[in-house]
C-alpha cells in the first residue's frame, strides 16, 4: 500500500493516498496475498531451476510449469485488485478517522465526510489551514490545523 493513512477494521481496511480514498475487503485480500506469496516462491524456484537446466525434456517441463504458475499469479493479482469495495477521488490527503459508518478526512484548507459503505461524499467544509488532526466525540468532529486553529463541527440530525 502506497499511501498516507490506513484504518483497519475486522472486515475492511480504509486507505488514504494523495489522490483517493478506498475500502478493501480484508479477508479476501489477505487470502489472495497468501496465495500470491506461495506462487511467487514457486515461480522463483522454477526460474532458478531453469537457469541451471540444459536443453531437453526437463527444461521443456520447467518452462511449462513456470508458464502455468505465471498465469495463476496473474489471476491472483487481478483478483487482489477486485478486492476494493470502492475507490473515490479525494482532495483531503492529510488525516483520516472513522466514526461509525462515517470516514472523516482532512486536507488542504478543507475537511470532508464519506460514507464508509460506498465512499459517497456526505459533507465537506472549508478549514483554516492544513487539517492534520481529527477527533470525534459526542456527535462532534474536532479538527486542528497547521495554523493552530481548532474547529468543532456538530453533526446535523436528519429530519430536524
Outline where the language-model segments fall.
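Noncatalytic, solvent-exposed loop/strand surfaces
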Residues: 1-160
Amino acid at each position: 500500500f502506497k499511501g498516507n493513512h490506513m484504518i483497519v477494521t475486522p472486515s475492511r481496511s480504509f486507505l488514504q493516498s494523495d489522490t483517493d480514498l478506498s475500502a478493501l475487503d480484508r479477508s479476501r485480500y489477505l487470502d489472495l496475498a497468501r496465495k500470491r506469496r506461495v506462487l511467487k516462491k514457486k515461480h522463483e524456484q522454477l526460474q532458478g531451476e531453469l537457469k541451471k537446466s540444459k536443453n531437453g525434456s526437463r527444461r521443456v517441463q520447467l518452462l511449462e510449469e513456470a508458464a502455468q504458475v505465471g498465469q495463476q499469479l496473474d489471476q491472483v493479482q487481478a483478483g487482489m485488485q477486485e478486492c476494493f469495495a470502492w475507490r473515490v477521488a479525494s482532495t483531503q490527503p492529510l488525516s483520516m478517522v472513522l466514526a461509525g459508518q462515517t470516514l472523516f478526512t482532512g486536507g488542504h484548507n478543507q475537511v470532508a465526510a464519506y460514507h464508509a459503505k460506498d465512499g459517497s461524499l456526505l459533507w465537506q467544509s472549508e478549514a483554516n489551514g492544513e487539517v492534520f488532526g481529527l477527533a470525534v466525540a459526542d456527535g462532534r468532529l474536532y479538527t486542528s490545523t497547521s495554523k493552530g486553529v481548532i474547529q468543532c463541527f456538530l453533526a446535523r440530525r436528519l429530519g430536524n
